[in-house]
């Protein structure tokens, strides 16, 4: 329950992609603003929940982290089924992970049909520019072709564009459609939320790289 006594609106976000692309790191960076250099593959499905503040509104995000290994694929459709947002992550240094985006999008569409689900494609590990195999332009083109609403490149290691990604996603949710607040309202609300433990305030998050588009 929120402090006003009203239940927070909850949005389920499912993270999809091949093993090792950085799905867990993306969640960890957003939740705790940390990065773990020691890779551990997700076993099955992990779940985390976080309260997020934006535009004088507070919502609850349910983040579902799925395993990329083939042996866990049979578990994933049931978690896609009632999701509001599907984030498909690929590694910009691994072309194979990029080529599998089509399959993940197909899985989402098979489970969600024509329902209103927000598709996001994220190219992670943008800090590894010397090892890049997929250009930003190629990623943007793929996102538009597959009907993704959001495309962005991130670096969970460096912290680039992670909060900006979630801000862009939040702005696409029904809760924030046509949401307006004055600078004074935002300043006062931001100050108040700084004292709320466990709440992520993304009001001031901005894109840090020229590698994002609203598709």
Swiss-Prot record:
Membrane-topology descriptor: Lipid-anchor
Residues recorded with modification Cysteine methyl ester: 215
Principal location listed in the UniProt entry: membrane
Residues at which GTP binds: 17-24, 65-69, 124-127
A single GO BP: retrograde vesicle-mediated transport, Golgi to endoplasmic reticulum
Keywords: Cell membrane, GTP-binding, Lipoprotein, Membrane, Methylation, Nucleotide-binding, Prenylation, Protein transport, Transport
Lipid anchor positions (S-geranylgeranyl cysteine): 213, 215
Name of the molecule in the record: GTP-binding protein YPT6
Gene: YPT6
Nucleotide-binding is among the record's keywords: yes
Gene Ontology molecular function, alphabetical: GTP binding; GTPase activity
Location in or out of the cell: Cell membrane
Further details from the record: Present with 7720 molecules/cell in log phase SD medium.
Polar residues bias (residue ranges): 178-196
PROSITE patterns, per the entry: RAB
SUPFAM superfamilies per UniProt: P-loop containing nucleoside triphosphate hydrolases
Annotated GO CC locations: cis-Golgi network; cytosol; endomembrane system; Golgi apparatus; phagophore assembly site; plasma membrane
Residue window of motif Effector region: 39-47
Role summary: Protein transport. Might participate in post-Golgi transport.
Subunit text: Interacts with YIF1, YIP3 and YIP4.
Region (Disordered): 178-215
Family: Belongs to the small GTPase superfamily. Rab family.
Source species taxonomy: Eukaryota, Fungi, Dikarya, Ascomycota, Saccharomycotina
């Amino acid at each position: 329950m929120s402090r006003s006594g009203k239940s927070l609106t909850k949005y389920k976000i499912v993270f999809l992609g091949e093993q090792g692309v950085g799905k867990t790191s993306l969640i960890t960076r957003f939740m705790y603003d940390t990065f773990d250099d020691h890779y551990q593959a997700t076993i099955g499905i992990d779940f985390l929940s976080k309260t997020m503040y934006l535009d004088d509104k507070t919502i609850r995000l349910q983040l579902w982290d799925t395993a990329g290994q083939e042996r866990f694929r049979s578990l994933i459709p049931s978690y896609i089924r009632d999701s509001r947002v599907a984030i498909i992550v690929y590694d910009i240094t691994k072309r194979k992970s990029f080529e599998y985006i089509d399959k993940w999008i197909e899985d989402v569409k098979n489970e969600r049909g024509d329902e209103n689900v927000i598709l996001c494609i994220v190219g992670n590990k943008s800090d590894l520019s010397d090892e890049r195999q997929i250009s930003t332009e190629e990623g943007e083109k793929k996102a538009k072709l597959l009907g993704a609403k959001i495309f962005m490149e991130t670096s969970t290691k460096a912290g680039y564009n992670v909060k900006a990604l979630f801000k862009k996603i939040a702005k696409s949710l029904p809760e924030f459609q046509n949401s307006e607040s004055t600078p004074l309202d935002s300043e006062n609300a931001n100050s108040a939320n700084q004292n709320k433990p466990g709440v992520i305030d993304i009001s001031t998050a901005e894109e840090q790289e020229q590698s994002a588009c609203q598709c």
